[in-house]
């Protein structure tokens, strides 16, 4: 599994994320992608790496990110506003669908706890 830390912007805040690719990925290929969302007051580095490993082993590119104000992302720390988190998810999807490894017509969103609601 290939992994790298990436950043993207959501409404002016820089969000931090992990981007995972399967080891068997072939350049030029476009695969379905998955965005992983952490729960209510979680961070991307707890629990989500296990799920990322599962999805990547199944062949999916995966983006796991911290909402603004959580983990390595900018923003007011630990502030939870559902509308802002929805904007962050939309911007995570936009980032993922722009990656050359990902088929933008085949995307999924998966989350734990409140991240899956």
What is each of the regions a protein language model found here?
Residues 1-32:
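N-terminal cap/lid segment of alpha/beta-hydrolase-fold proteins
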Residues 116-117:
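Short glycine-enriched nucleophile-adjacent loop
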Residues 11, 31, 36-43, 113:
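Active-site glycine-rich loops that stabilize anionic/oxyanionic intermediates
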């Amino acid at each position: 599994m290939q992994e790298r830390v990436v950043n993207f912007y959501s409404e002016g805040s820089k969000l931090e994320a992990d981007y995972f690719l399967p080891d068997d990925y072939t350049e030029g290929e476009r695969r379905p992608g998955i965005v992983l969302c952490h729960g209510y007051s979680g961070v991307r580095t707890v629990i989500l790496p296990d799920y990322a490993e599962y999805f990547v082993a199944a062949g999916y590119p995966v983006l796991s990110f911290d909402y603004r104000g959580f983990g390595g992302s900018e923003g007011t720390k630990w502030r939870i506003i559902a509308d802002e988190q929805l904007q962050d998810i939309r911007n995570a999807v936009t980032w993922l669908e722009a990656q050359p490894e990902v088929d933008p017509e085949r995307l999924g969103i998966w989350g734990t706890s409140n991240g899956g609601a």
